[in-house]
UniProtKB/Swiss-Prot annotation:
It is found in: Cell inner membrane. GO terms for cellular component: plasma membrane. This is Disulfide bond formation protein B. Keywords: Cell inner membrane, Cell membrane, Chaperone, Disulfide bond, Electron transport, Membrane, Oxidoreductase, Redox-active center, Transmembrane, Transmembrane helix, Transport. One of its GO terms (molecular function) is electron transfer activity. It comes from Chromohalobacter salexigens (strain ATCC BAA-138 / DSM 3043 / CIP 106854 / NCIMB 13768 / 1H11). It holds the Pfam family DsbB. The chain crosses the membrane at residues 14-30, 49-65, 73-90, 148-166.
Amino acid sequence: MIIRLAGMSVRQGCLLGLLMCALMMGVALVLQYVYGLTPCPLCIGQRIAVLLAAFVFAIGALHNPAGNLGRGLYAGLAALASVLGLAVAARHVWLQSLPPENVPSCGPGLDYMMEVLPLWDVLSRVLAGSGECAEIHGSLLGMSIPQWTLLGFAVLLLIPLGMLAGIVIRRR
């Protein structure tokens, strides 16, 4: 699969990544607005990572650089956003796997924290997670929503890795 992705142009790879990001955000918005699931702070962090990756992919598709430098830049930034999302999703899955007595207590809402705390404090508290992040709201095929998101970020990461592999293959 990586070899197939390596053969794509920058525009094709970025459009594929953008499509994957749109799919991930579409599912998140359906879960929120159709099924009424309120996103927890870690869910919002994962959405931010998807939007960052989507932004990089969109700019890369529009720019469509011809050289390896541009290809590497967009692939590297998209990989960074994907790894960020992967890390937040992994933290979310870990919180959900904790026994109930080890789950952190619920903290104030994200809106309140954004109003009264400095940005770095908000980020550290959001990434630490809270009790609401440990709740499991159903499953699909035996996997929770954060587990599916973790899988989504792993698949998303394959796209910039394939783009980077294209640089290595072209140099040979």
